[in-house]
Amino acid sequence: MNDPYKAFCDDFYVNLRLGSQLNLPHSRETLLHFFERVQKEFPNMTRFRKADNGDLNLEEDRGNHSYRWAAIEAKRLAAGHVNPASIEEALKLHKLMMQLAPYHLGISPVEIDYLDILFGFDLAFTGNHDEIISESMFGSSPLNCLAEEGGARAVDFQPTVTVALTEDCRLQARIDVVTRTNSYQVRTGDYSEDVISVYLILRRYWGDHPKEPMENMIEEMATRADELCSSHIIPRILRPISNAIASRS
């Protein structure tokens, strides 16, 4: 599963999210011990910070093209690898997080709500993001009918689609397209360089309390996500968006 996405985006990342129905522990000793254990495996993760909302983050230097990060939120454990050399490389941190969670944070399968694997793609563009999505994603769709009105300008085209991949609906896949221009920019033509983001999220709900180790599930979900990207996301979403951006350069 080598990274095949460089030709279609400026940044690619693989994120992990483990949601709990209970608050995660936030005692000083527990948190420091957990982050020290992560740092032992990834010595370049040296930047520790606490956000205003109480979230705790340990990360590598974001100034580098490729970097890792890990976070403990109120009810969620999260991690990410931006521009990994391969999918396998990104999963090293994620598997470690799942191995440590039960023993260092006391996370029990009983409390788990969901497990997410997110493949993210950022495409830089200075201009009307929503216009790009309107043209590349909607085209002749009936949902694009308002764009046919005289003087109409796209200001909010952010589609999201979710499907169940299993009969019990516990494994679901979602596509989110996120734009970052606003009405002021459309009105004035004063655009700043920002990114259009495309997310493919595989979510495994935990109601049946699966017995398989979480690190194995992560690898299976990442493999499925990679297959979905090859068969659907690249040819039907990333390539049309990239072509629309290139047509304006």
Task: Go through the PLM ranges and name each one.
Residues M1-A74, A78-G80, I245-S247:
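N-terminal low-complexity, intrinsically disordered segments
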Residues M1-N2, R62-S66, A101, R180-V186:
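Short amphipathic beta-strand starts and helix->beta connectors
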Residues F8-L18, R68-N83, E111-G120, D194-Y205:
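Glycine-rich, often proline-containing surface loops adjacent to acidic residues and nearby aromatics
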Residues Q21-T30, E88-A90, D208-E215:
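Short, conserved charged micro-motifs
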Residues Q39-F42, M98-L105, C229:
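A common structural junction motif
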Residues I72-C145:
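Internal, hydrophobic cores of structured domains that mediate oligomerization or house catalytic pockets
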Residues L115-D190, Y199:
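Aromatic/basic-lined ligand-recognition segments
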Residues S197-S249:
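C-terminal structured interaction module
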